[in-house]
């Protein structure tokens, strides 16, 4: 598959890059056979045989080494980048629990990564902003929810056809896996630590924060469902059981002591505030572990 990259060095400390790659992913065994919770149904849709997913990925970024301005720093740099990925023939489940291949999935986002290290104090900050995550299909929209009699009645009264969204945020089907595989709009990871006793003792704290998913398929499909409910006297909603998570900040801390050249002891506390939450992109409603304390010794031989 084609791939290329280009880098421009502005100075000894700064550069920009452009990267393009293409990849193929063939259907897995789980996606290509009949079994529990799945059925290989792509041949039911005319023109859709099994084909590999074909991704075209663009990334552009800027990297700057700050040690030229801060010579006493051992490390000090940042990177900012933007990516845009388009995948054709995306595999996902439909409302009949059958795997189908849909036209395309488009994902884009921006990232900022920065770090510093003075020798005594060190830290890092990583920020991710999800800009777009949608799946599109020109024909699947007509195989969902609205019955033909409603279409005919609406056309007879208005002279218009009922429009359905071609693209949906996340996935096209409530029963699909991609509908819950949505990255939060914001994700932030930060770390701050320090070293003592001739670097034999290291301690630090870590923060992980993610926001909620702000977009869903309700906004795109609600006008269509309003018409359907009006003609059928029902109260159907576009979104039934999609998983959603709330924003959460999780704090961890650790203490690491180098006993000898090949022996290290560590004390780690995870989720110190004992938050009850779901990890983003969870496949189930199993919550993340609560407050956890771990003690360990690692030896190298």
For the regions a language model picked out, list residue spans one by one.
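Transmembrane beta-barrel architecture of outer-membrane proteins
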Residues: 1-2, 20-24, 52-58, 64, ...
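Signature of Gram-negative outer-membrane beta-barrel scaffolds
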Residues: 1-14, 126-131
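Residues on the lipid-exposed face of transmembrane beta-strands in outer-membrane beta-barrel proteins
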Residues: 4-8, 60-64, 110-118, 188-194, ...
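Surface-exposed extracellular loop regions of Gram-negative outer-membrane beta-barrel proteins
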Residues: 8, 12-59, 78, 82-102, ...
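Outer-membrane beta-barrel strand-turn architecture
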Residues: 8-12, 54, 64-72, 86, ...
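C-terminal beta-signal and adjacent terminal beta-strands/loops
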Residues: 24-25, 208-232, 245-248, 254-301
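Gram-negative outer-membrane beta-barrel transporters
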Residues: 70-87, 100-219
């Amino acid at each position: 598959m084609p791939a290329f990259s280009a880098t421009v060095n502005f100075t000894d400390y700064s550069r920009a890059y452009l990267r393009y790659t293409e990849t193929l992913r063939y259907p897995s065994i789980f996606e290509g056979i009949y079994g529990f919770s799945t059925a290989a149904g792509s041949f039911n849709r005319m023109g859709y045989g099994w084909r590999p997913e074909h991704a075209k990925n663009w990334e552009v970024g800027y990297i700057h080494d700050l040690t030229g301005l801060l010579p006493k720093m051992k490390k000090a740099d940042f990177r900012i980048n933007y990516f845009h990925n388009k995948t054709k023939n995306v595999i996902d489940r439909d409302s009949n629990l059958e795997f189908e291949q849909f036209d395309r999935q488009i994902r884009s986002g921006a990232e900022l990564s920065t770090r510093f290290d003075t020798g005594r104090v060190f830290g890092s900050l990583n920020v991710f902003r999800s800009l777009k995550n949608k799946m599109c299909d020109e024909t699947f929209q007509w195989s969902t929810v609205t019955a033909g009699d409603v279409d005919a009645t609406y056309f007879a009264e208005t002279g218009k056809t009922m429009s359905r969204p071609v693209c949906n945020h996340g996935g096209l089907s409530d029963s699909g896996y991609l509908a819950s595989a949505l990255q939060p709009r914001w994700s932030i990871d930060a770390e701050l630590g320090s070293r003592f006793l001739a670097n034999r003792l290291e301690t630090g704290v870590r923060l992980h924060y993610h926001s909620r998913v702000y977009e869903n398929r309700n906004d795109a499909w609600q006008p269509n469902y309003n018409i359907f409910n009006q003609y059928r006297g029902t109260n159907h909603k576009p979104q039934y059981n999609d998983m959603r998570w709330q924003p959460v900040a999780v704090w961890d801390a650790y203490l690491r002591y180098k006993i000898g050249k090949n022996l290290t002891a560590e004390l780690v506390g995870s989720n110190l505030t004992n938050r009850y939450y779901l990890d983003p992109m969870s496949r189930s409603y199993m919550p993340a572990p609560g407050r956890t304390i771990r003690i360990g010794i690692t030896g190298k031989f």
